[in-house]
């Protein structure tokens, strides 16, 4: 990381690992992905004064259309997970105010049907397509700078999935 960015803070964020009854995990392909490599689980910033669980349910609803009554919160990560953006993205995302994200992750069990997932529930949409994948597949689908965090989240939640 460029020393000019090292003093920037991390953006407070919540991540959601949504699992179905078969133990598969939701991933969405980012709508701005041109290369087919930017898949991710739902995640987003925590607003000032917002608590973790409501932030997770809000992000889930905005990005997937999944209503709160269709999920059960199973677990919360023991610690926050940090990642740094590549230097070339720091000035382009979040107004250049953050060096990366500080994420707390929640594991949620999905009790709905696939038809309850609506990527067009929020404008603008976050994802262009989605699928269920095995937890072990996640890190290989994710942009390289987030892979370490995804491995940590999979390892932490593996026995609960």
From Swiss-Prot:
Gene3D superfamilies: Nucleoside Triphosphate Pyrophosphohydrolase. Signal peptide: none annotated. It is an enzyme of class 3 (hydrolase). GO terms for molecular function: bis(5'-adenosyl)-pentaphosphatase activity; guanosine-3',5'-bis(diphosphate) 3'-diphosphatase activity. GO terms for biological process: nucleoside phosphate metabolic process; ribose phosphate metabolic process. Accelerates the degradation of transcripts by removing pyrophosphate from the 5'-end of triphosphorylated RNA, leading to a more labile monophosphorylated state that can stimulate subsequent ribonuclease cleavage. Belongs to the Nudix hydrolase family. RppH subfamily. This is RNA pyrophosphohydrolase. The lineage of its organism: Bacteria, Pseudomonadati, Pseudomonadota, Alphaproteobacteria, Sphingomonadales. The gene is rppH.
């Amino acid at each position: 990381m460029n020393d000019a960015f090292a003093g920037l803070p991390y953006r407070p964020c919540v991540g959601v690992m949504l699992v179905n009854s078969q133990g598969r995990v939701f991933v969405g392909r980012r709508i701005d992905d041109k290369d087919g490599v930017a898949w991710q689980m739902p995640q987003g910033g925590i607003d000032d004064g917002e608590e973790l669980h409501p932030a997770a349910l809000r992000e889930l609803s905005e990005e997937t259309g999944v209503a709160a009554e269709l999920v059960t919160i199973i677990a919360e990560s023991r610690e926050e997970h940090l990642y740094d953006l590549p230097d070339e993205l720091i000035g382009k995302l979040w107004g250049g105010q953050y060096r990366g994200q500080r994420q707390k992750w929640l594991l949620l069990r999905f009790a709905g049907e696939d038809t309850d997932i609506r990527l067009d529930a929020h404008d603008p949409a976050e994802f262009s397509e989605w699928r269920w994948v095995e937890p072990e597949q996640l890190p290989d689908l994710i942009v390289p700078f987030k892979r370490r965090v995804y491995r940590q989240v999979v390892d932490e939640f593996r026995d609960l999935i």
